[in-house]
Amino acid sequence: MNRISKAFLACTCGLFCLGIQAQNHTIWTNDFSNTGETLKVVGRGTCSIADNVFRSKGSYALFGNPEWTNYSFSVKARAPEDAEQVQIWASFRNYNRFDRYVVGIKGGLQDDLYLMRTGYMGTDEFMGVRPLGFHPVPGEWYRMKVEVCGNRIRVFLNDEK
Protein backbone atom coordinates (compact mmCIF):
# COMPACT_ATOMS: atom_id res chain seq x y z
CA MET A 1 0.00 0.00 0.00
CA ASN A 2 2.91 2.33 0.67
CA ARG A 3 3.78 2.29 -3.04
CA ILE A 4 0.17 3.11 -3.96
CA SER A 5 0.05 5.91 -1.38
CA LYS A 6 3.21 7.43 -2.77
CA ALA A 7 1.89 7.08 -6.29
CA PHE A 8 -1.36 8.72 -5.22
CA LEU A 9 0.41 11.59 -3.54
CA ALA A 10 2.88 11.96 -6.40
CA CYS A 11 0.12 11.91 -8.97
CA THR A 12 -0.06 15.00 -11.07
CA CYS A 13 -3.27 15.23 -12.94
CA GLY A 14 -5.41 17.99 -14.32
CA LEU A 15 -9.08 17.78 -13.54
CA PHE A 16 -11.17 19.62 -16.06
CA CYS A 17 -14.67 19.20 -14.68
CA LEU A 18 -16.04 17.59 -11.55
CA GLY A 19 -19.75 16.94 -11.23
CA ILE A 20 -21.60 15.27 -8.40
CA GLN A 21 -25.23 14.25 -8.18
CA ALA A 22 -26.67 13.40 -4.74
CA GLN A 23 -29.75 11.42 -3.70
CA ASN A 24 -32.40 14.12 -4.18
CA HIS A 25 -31.15 15.07 -7.65
CA THR A 26 -29.16 17.99 -6.34
CA ILE A 27 -26.47 18.70 -8.87
CA TRP A 28 -23.17 20.19 -7.76
CA THR A 29 -20.64 21.04 -10.42
CA ASN A 30 -17.27 22.69 -10.57
CA ASP A 31 -15.73 23.71 -13.87
CA PHE A 32 -12.74 25.30 -12.09
CA SER A 33 -13.38 28.70 -13.64
CA ASN A 34 -12.97 30.45 -10.26
CA THR A 35 -9.20 30.77 -9.82
CA GLY A 36 -9.74 32.35 -6.40
CA GLU A 37 -11.66 29.36 -5.03
CA THR A 38 -10.49 28.32 -1.57
CA LEU A 39 -9.41 24.68 -1.76
CA LYS A 40 -9.52 22.27 1.17
CA VAL A 41 -6.12 20.66 0.55
CA VAL A 42 -4.99 17.42 2.19
CA GLY A 43 -1.27 16.63 2.18
CA ARG A 44 1.91 18.65 1.92
CA GLY A 45 1.97 19.11 -1.83
CA THR A 46 0.28 21.74 -3.95
CA CYS A 47 -3.17 22.17 -5.46
CA SER A 48 -4.07 25.01 -7.78
CA ILE A 49 -6.62 26.16 -10.34
CA ALA A 50 -5.57 27.85 -13.58
CA ASP A 51 -7.17 28.01 -17.03
CA ASN A 52 -10.20 25.97 -15.86
CA VAL A 53 -7.94 23.10 -14.79
CA PHE A 54 -7.33 21.77 -11.27
CA ARG A 55 -3.74 20.62 -10.76
CA SER A 56 -2.33 18.66 -7.85
CA LYS A 57 1.07 17.29 -6.93
CA GLY A 58 1.78 15.51 -3.69
CA SER A 59 -1.66 16.32 -2.27
CA TYR A 60 -5.34 16.42 -3.12
CA ALA A 61 -8.35 18.65 -2.50
CA LEU A 62 -11.80 17.79 -1.13
CA PHE A 63 -15.00 18.70 -2.98
CA GLY A 64 -18.71 18.13 -2.37
CA ASN A 65 -20.47 17.26 0.87
CA PRO A 66 -19.26 14.41 3.14
CA GLU A 67 -22.84 13.75 4.29
CA TRP A 68 -23.98 12.57 0.84
CA THR A 69 -24.69 8.83 0.80
CA ASN A 70 -26.06 7.99 -2.66
CA TYR A 71 -24.38 9.97 -5.42
CA SER A 72 -22.34 9.85 -8.58
CA PHE A 73 -19.38 11.92 -9.64
CA SER A 74 -17.29 12.19 -12.75
CA VAL A 75 -13.87 13.60 -13.48
CA LYS A 76 -12.08 14.35 -16.69
CA ALA A 77 -8.35 14.09 -16.04
CA ARG A 78 -4.97 13.57 -17.62
CA ALA A 79 -1.37 13.13 -16.62
CA PRO A 80 1.03 15.81 -17.90
CA GLU A 81 2.49 15.16 -21.35
CA ASP A 82 6.00 14.85 -19.90
CA ALA A 83 4.94 12.28 -17.25
CA GLU A 84 6.62 8.87 -17.32
CA GLN A 85 3.27 7.12 -17.05
CA VAL A 86 -0.39 7.85 -16.45
CA GLN A 87 -1.65 7.74 -12.87
CA ILE A 88 -5.03 9.31 -12.21
CA TRP A 89 -6.53 8.82 -8.76
CA ALA A 90 -9.74 10.05 -7.15
CA SER A 91 -11.09 9.27 -3.70
CA PHE A 92 -14.58 9.36 -2.25
CA ARG A 93 -16.36 8.60 1.02
CA ASN A 94 -13.43 10.28 2.72
CA TYR A 95 -13.69 9.93 6.48
CA ASN A 96 -10.17 11.28 6.91
CA ARG A 97 -6.82 11.11 5.13
CA PHE A 98 -6.45 7.40 5.85
CA ASP A 99 -10.03 6.07 5.69
CA ARG A 100 -11.49 6.42 2.21
CA TYR A 101 -12.23 4.68 -1.07
CA VAL A 102 -9.89 5.26 -4.01
CA VAL A 103 -10.37 4.62 -7.72
CA GLY A 104 -7.53 4.99 -10.16
CA ILE A 105 -6.19 4.49 -13.65
CA LYS A 106 -2.59 3.29 -13.65
CA GLY A 107 -0.57 3.00 -16.84
CA GLY A 108 3.05 2.07 -17.38
CA LEU A 109 3.83 -1.63 -17.10
CA GLN A 110 0.38 -2.35 -15.68
CA ASP A 111 -2.55 -0.81 -17.53
CA ASP A 112 -5.16 -1.36 -14.84
CA LEU A 113 -8.18 0.18 -13.15
CA TYR A 114 -8.01 0.01 -9.35
CA LEU A 115 -10.73 0.21 -6.72
CA MET A 116 -9.57 0.03 -3.12
CA ARG A 117 -10.42 1.01 0.39
CA THR A 118 -7.71 2.49 2.57
CA GLY A 119 -7.94 2.20 6.31
CA TYR A 120 -6.16 3.12 9.49
CA MET A 121 -3.23 0.97 10.65
CA GLY A 122 -2.90 -1.07 7.48
CA THR A 123 -6.50 -2.18 7.07
CA ASP A 124 -6.27 -1.42 3.35
CA GLU A 125 -7.91 -3.75 0.86
CA PHE A 126 -8.11 -4.05 -2.89
CA MET A 127 -11.73 -4.33 -3.92
CA GLY A 128 -11.01 -4.78 -7.60
CA VAL A 129 -8.25 -4.63 -10.18
CA ARG A 130 -9.25 -4.90 -13.83
CA PRO A 131 -7.24 -4.54 -17.03
CA LEU A 132 -8.02 -1.35 -18.91
CA GLY A 133 -7.85 -2.95 -22.32
CA PHE A 134 -5.80 -0.01 -23.61
CA HIS A 135 -2.53 1.73 -22.80
CA PRO A 136 -3.09 5.18 -21.22
CA VAL A 137 -0.95 7.90 -22.80
CA PRO A 138 0.31 10.97 -20.88
CA GLY A 139 -1.36 14.14 -22.13
CA GLU A 140 -4.59 12.42 -23.24
CA TRP A 141 -7.82 13.13 -21.36
CA TYR A 142 -9.69 10.28 -19.66
CA ARG A 143 -13.10 10.37 -18.06
CA MET A 144 -14.01 8.40 -14.92
CA LYS A 145 -17.51 8.15 -13.49
CA VAL A 146 -18.21 6.61 -10.08
CA GLU A 147 -21.70 5.74 -8.83
CA VAL A 148 -22.17 5.14 -5.11
CA CYS A 149 -25.48 3.70 -3.89
CA GLY A 150 -25.59 2.20 -0.41
CA ASN A 151 -22.85 -0.42 -0.29
CA ARG A 152 -22.57 -0.65 -4.10
CA ILE A 153 -19.89 1.11 -6.14
CA ARG A 154 -19.76 1.16 -9.94
CA VAL A 155 -16.92 2.64 -11.99
CA PHE A 156 -17.13 3.62 -15.66
CA LEU A 157 -14.34 4.77 -17.96
CA ASN A 158 -14.67 7.22 -20.81
CA ASP A 159 -18.17 6.77 -22.27
CA GLU A 160 -19.05 3.37 -20.77
CA LYS A 161 -22.57 2.96 -19.44
Question: What does each model-identified segment do?
Answer:
Residues M121-R143:
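Short, aromatic/His-centered strand-loop micro-motif at the edge of beta-sheets
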Residues Q23-R44:
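Extracellular carbohydrate-recognition regions
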